[in-house]
Structures are given as C-alpha cells and as structure tokens.
C-alpha cells in the first residue's frame, strides 16, 4: 500500500534549511560551550595563580572561560552585561574594605541574580568575619586564600558548577511548567493544542536533560489510501512552522526518510542518534515523535516519551471531537437560518454576510475574540421568528398596512420563544440578538423601546449589519440601493437608529465590508 505523496507545501524548517544538515554538529558544539567563571581580585598574582591551578579543568566535558577584573566596579559592569556567569570568585577587600561585600549585595539585590554561585576569597579574614558574612550575605562559600590549594580550588569548582547547573535546570523546568500550565488552560481547539503540546515537549526534553531536536506530528490516512494528511503539532526547534501539511518537507533527508520508514512500517525505531516513536489510535490516526539526541536514551526516558505521545494523542483526539461538535452546531444554525431566509424568499448568502459583518464590527469595537465569535455564530438566527409569519405578509410586494406591520413585528416574540427552549450559550446569545436587533439607539425601536447602552452590544451590532446588507440587496418590496445611498442612510441614522461608534467604524472600514458583500453574492 502506498502511503505518501507530498506536494509543494510550506517548508517546515524554512529559516533553518542550511543548518539542518549539521544538526549533530550543532548539538556537539552546544555541549562544548564553556562555563563562565568571573575572577574578581585587585591582586594580579591571584589571577595568575588561579588560572594556573585551573589549567585543563573541565566539567561535563565543558571547559572554563575565565574572566578577570581587578575591582568591584569592573565586576558590576560584567555582571550587568552577561547573564551566563556561573561562578564568581570575589575578593573581599579591593578598592574599599568592603568592595566584595558590596558586589555581592549588588548582584543579589539589584540584579536579582540568584543563579550565579558566589564564593568570597579573602586574605584578611579579620576584616570580614566568616560567621557574620555567611549570615548576612547570600553567598555560597567563604574561603581564606591560603587554604585554597589547587585540589581544593578544583573541588570547589566542581561543587559550585554542579549547583549552578542544577539551579539552571530547575529554572528551566519552572519556566517550562508555566508554559504547560498556561497552554493547558486554553486547550480549546487544534491551534491552541500546538502551544500545549510544544510546551509539554520542551518540558519533557528538559527534564530528561536532552540536548534534543524533537518534533511531534500526526498523520491521518486519506480514503483513497494514496497519501496521508500530516500535521506537525509540536516542536522544540525555533522558527518552525507548526500545523502545516507536508510537515517533512524541508527537513534533512535522513530525518524525512526515518519518519516515512516508521510510518510505513508502523513501528518504533532506534537509529542510534535519534529515536522515532510510532503510535496509532483507535481511529486509525498515526502519530510520530522524532527525538534527535547525542546520548543514549534510558528505558525510563523512552517510557516518558511514549507516555507523552499517548496523552497528547488522546488530547488531540478529544479536541478534534470537540471542534467537530462545534462545527456541527454552527452548520445546524446556518441550515436553520437558511431555511428561514428561503421561506422569506431571501438568499442564504444574506445570513452568511451578516455573520461576517458582525464578526468584523465586533473586532473593530474591541470585543474579545470569544465574544466576537459568539456573535458571529449566533447572528444568523436573528430572524428565526419569521417562520411563524404568514406568507401573505412575508411576500407582500408593497408596503405593509398597520395590522400587517403589527403581525410582522411579532416575529421577534416568536424568535425569542423558539430560542428560549435551549439553555446553551450560543442559543442564549441568539435569543438576545433576536429580541433586540430591531431596537434603536434613540429608543424608538421595538419591541421594548430600549435605548442606548440598554440594548445589548450583540443586538446593536447585528442591527447595523442586517440593515447594511438589506439596503444593498434586492428584496420583494425594493431594488438594491447604491453604495452612496447606503452611506447617506447610515449617516442619517447615526445616533437615531444606530450607535454612533458603530456607524463610524463601518464607514471608516467601508472597503472591507464591501469586499465581504462581493465575496458572497446572492
């Protein structure tokens, strides 16, 4: 069975294309970055002795970068400019008797740097008693220069660098956890699943101490079995386009080949410098998690990554189900609205246009995305009550008489009655719109003669959107108005029928609304 047929989709690693082939080399280089150690002492001989004692020193296969300064003032400049100082060996007495102590206070309190390890070295212990200094200053050790032999100095560095490494890891995990929490609080659709899945993947690789390039994608087989729809939903690499089709395009050839092998063979593979996990859920949706690394994964590491795949896959499935249900409800709303419009001998394009006008006006008005989306999806039902109005009135070509007009106004009441049977948020907003979109800003509307801000914003927005579209459309009782006539009418009804701000927004963005109308002709 042939599984893959890739088109000319967007490059997944567009900005990283030239670097991608050298992924392993970049990882090795990353592991060789030196540990930055700041030497602060006004005695140049101490710098020379320290450098000699630390010749050839390495921790976790990373060398040292020794930065020498001769005063507390110089040290302040270095600490303010660099955030990668792992350890500072600080003399207590320099340009002043307490210059070293002042530097410690500056680093901890003004710079708020809690990660750098600080060790005081003094040749005059009486100037700064150890007990008082340890108690009052946030330092990690206190040494007399005479006691720091070569071996003890190297032992000190192992201890301090190990502590710095662990603090950095904890900080990374805290940041990663905050991303996970932030993302998980908003996992409501497949787009927000990206941030959630990526945050968890970053957190996981951090916990496992992997200098890894990882990405996670799902592949859905198409009915014709000739290709698959694959989407990348998580990655640890920067500048990567997420959630695009043809996710393997732009990746190094060996990575593409491995992912395709795993998907076609439906099995997890260990490639030595990369591990590619495979999973298939109950719906036949395949998932691939690619993790490139420099060290071998332990059995626990693999288990954690497999758990990640399972849970993200389950979340993805649940989110897709939720999205499917939401889209189904939208379709039902539009189908019902189209049926009402068809009975009124108006096209279904009217409710679609009104919905888009409402969404754009809501955004321009400054409403939240969720509120704008709700108004957009509820507005098609603004005239649902017309199903209860006799055809003789709905289709009358001329002007309605007083009795007919009173009956026509009843469609608001009928619409509220129909929509009130559901307690769902969408239906409640639709009820609000049906009840108020014929109210007017000056209080002369119907059915309740509401005025100004007493009219819900959903009703105010739908009112102007409905009239704007109706004026430009051919109806049984009128020909379409010209754009100039519509503009003049909106200006005339500013502060009377419509909220002034909404009129101004529509006129300021006139071309956008005309473009919407043109995109959905009757």
Curated annotation (Swiss-Prot):
Claim: Ligase is one of the keywords in the record: no
Residues noted as binding a divalent metal cation 2 in the record, renumbered to the chain: 383, 411, 437-438
Positions bearing 4-aspartylphosphate: 91
A Pfam family per the record: DUF3369
Catalytic activity, reaction form: 3',3'-cGAMP + H2O = 5'-pApG-3' + H(+)
Known EC number: 3.1.4.-
Manner of cofactor binding, per the entry note: Requires a divalent metal cation for activity. Likely has a bi-nuclear metal center. Has the highest enzyme activity with Mn(2+).
Positions with a binding annotation for a divalent metal cation 1: 382-383, 466
Protein's name according to its UniProt entry: 3'3'-cGAMP-specific phosphodiesterase 2
Residue ranges occupied by any HD-GYP domain in the UniProt entry: 325-522
pH dependence: Optimum pH is 9.0-11.0.
SMART domains in the cross-refs: HDc (SM00471)
Function description: Phosphodiesterase (PDE) that catalyzes the hydrolysis of 3'3'-cyclic GMP-AMP (3'3'-cGAMP), leading to linear 5'-pApG. Counteracts the function of the 3'3'-cGAMP synthase DncV, and is involved in the modulation of intracellular 3'3'-cGAMP levels. Enhances bacterial chemotaxis and inhibits intestinal colonization in vivo. Thus exerts a crucial role in regulating bacterial infectivity through catalyzing 3'3'-cGAMP degradation. Is specific for 3'3'-cGAMP since it cannot degrade other cGAMP linkage isomers (3'2'-, 2'3'-, and 2'2'-cGAMPs). Is also able to hydrolyze c-di-GMP but not c-di-AMP.
GO biological process: cyclic nucleotide catabolic process; phosphorelay signal transduction system
SUPFAM superfamilies, sorted: CheY-like (SSF52172), HD-domain/PDEase-like (SSF109604)
Traits of the deletion mutant: Significant increase in the ability to colonize the small intestine compared to the wild-type strain. No defect in biofilm formation. Enforced DncV expression in mutant cells lacking this gene causes an enhanced inhibition of chemotaxis. The double mutant lacking both VC_A0681 and VC_A0210 shows enhanced bacterial infectivity, and the triple one (VC_A0681, VC_A0210 and VC_A0931) has the highest infectivity, which demonstrates that V-cGAPs play non-redundant roles in cGAMP degradation.
Subunit-structure text: Homodimer.
């Amino acid at each position: 069975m042939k599984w893959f047929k890739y088109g000319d989709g967007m490059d997944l690693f567009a900005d990283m294309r030239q670097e991608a082939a050298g992924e392993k080399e970049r990882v090795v280089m990353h592991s060789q970055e030196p540990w930055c150690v700041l030497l602060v002492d006004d005695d140049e001989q101490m710098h020379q002795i320290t450098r000699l004692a630390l010749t050839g020193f390495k921790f976790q296969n990373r060398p040292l970068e020794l930065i020498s300064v001769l005063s507390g003032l110089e040290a302040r400049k270095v600490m303010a400019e660099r955030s990668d100082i792992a350890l500072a060996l600080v003399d207590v007495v320099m340009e002043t008797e307490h210059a070293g102590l002042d530097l410690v206070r500056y680093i901890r309190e003004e710079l708020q740097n809690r990660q750098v390890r600080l060790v005081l070295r003094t040749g005059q212990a009486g100037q700064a008693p150890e007990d008082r200094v340890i108690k009052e200053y946030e330092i990690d050790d206190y040494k007399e220069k005479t006691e720091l032999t070569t071996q003890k100095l190297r032992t000190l560095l192992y201890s301090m660098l190990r502590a710095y490494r662990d603090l950095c890891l904890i900080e990374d995990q805290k940041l990663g956890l905050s991303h996970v929490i932030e993302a998980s609080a908003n996992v409501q659709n497949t787009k927000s699943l990206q941030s959630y899945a990526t945050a968890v993947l970053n957190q996981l690789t951090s916990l496992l101490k992997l200098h890894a390039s990882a990405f996670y994608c799902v592949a859905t087989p198409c009915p014709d079995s000739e290709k698959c729809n694959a989407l990348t939903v998580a990655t640890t690499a920067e500048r990567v386009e997420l959630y695009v089709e043809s996710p393997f395009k732009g990746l190094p050839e060996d990575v593409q080949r491995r992912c395709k092998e795993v998907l076609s063979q439906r099995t997890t593979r260990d490639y030595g410098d990369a591990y590619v996990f495979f999973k298939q859920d109950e719906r036949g949706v395949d998932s691939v998690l690619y993790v490139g690394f420099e060290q071998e994964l332990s059995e626990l590491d693999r288990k954690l990554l497999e758990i990640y795949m399972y849970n993200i896959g389950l979340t993805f499935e649940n989110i897709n189900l939720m999205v499917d249900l939401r889209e189904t409800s939208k379709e039902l709303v539009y189908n019902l609205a189209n049926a009402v419009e068809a009975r009124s001998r108006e096209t279904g394009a009217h409710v679609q246009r009104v919905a888009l006008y409402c969404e754009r006006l809501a955004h321009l008005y400054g409403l939240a995305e969720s509120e704008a989306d709700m108004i957009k999806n509820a507005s098609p039902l603004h005239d649902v009550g017309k199903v209860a109005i006799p055809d003789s009135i709905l289709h009358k070509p001329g002007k309605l008489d007083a009795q007919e007009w009173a009956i026509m106004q009843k469609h608001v009441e009928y619409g509220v009655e129909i929509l009130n049977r559901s307690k769902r948020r969408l239906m409640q907003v639709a009820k609000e719109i049906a009840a108020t979109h014929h109210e007017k800003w000056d209080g002369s509307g119907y059915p309740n003669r509401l005025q100004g801000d007493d009219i819900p914003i959903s009703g105010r927005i739908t009112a102007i959107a409905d009239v704007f579209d109706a004026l430009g459309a051919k109806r049984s009782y009128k020909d379409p108005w010209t754009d100039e006539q519509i503009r003049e009418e909106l200006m005339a009804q500013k502060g009377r029928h419509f909220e002034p701000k909404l009129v101004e927004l529509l006129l300021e963005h006139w071309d956008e609304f005309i473009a919407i109308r043109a995109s959905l002709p009757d």
